[in-house]
Amino acid sequence: MVAIMNHNFFEQSKIFFENGDIKNTLETYEKAISYIDQKEKSSYLQFLNQILSYCRENNLKEEEAVVLRSLGRTHSIFKQYVESLKYHEESLKIQRQLGNKMDVAEGLLYLAEDLEVSGNYENCIKAFQDAEELFRELGKLRKTKEIQKELSRLMDFSKQMVEDEYYLKEFNIDKY
């Protein structure tokens, strides 16, 4: 069932792209991301790169930023976090230039998730804090509370890691 839903969304997205409807292409692909088939990795990445080229050739900056974010999310699903981070950073750069705070805030959340997975907790926390600030400015209080829970969890985890590291060094446990 999941594979069928993904296939339908992915195929719909391709049809929209062939018809030149970039907005619906990207919206439909966003739905397909939730059902990505791990065996079709190259198809997804190739498709997104085609859209990215089209957006760049036609100077569609807003759409380019969305495609870059989708590339980041797709690489993340395939556990290619270095590539994912690269695309998220590039997307955020464009979103900031465009001044769309909502897109920047959402992009920061995706960036934070990948930073956490890659073990870069300091930058992860910073990205979550920046996203929280933007969501607060936008009046998205529910989202702000969700981020605060994530931040609390990360702070507790970081504190535990520091304590564990201290005990390992203090009692020479790491030498055995």
Residue ranges and their predicted role:
Residues M1-Y176:
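Intrinsically disordered, low-complexity regions
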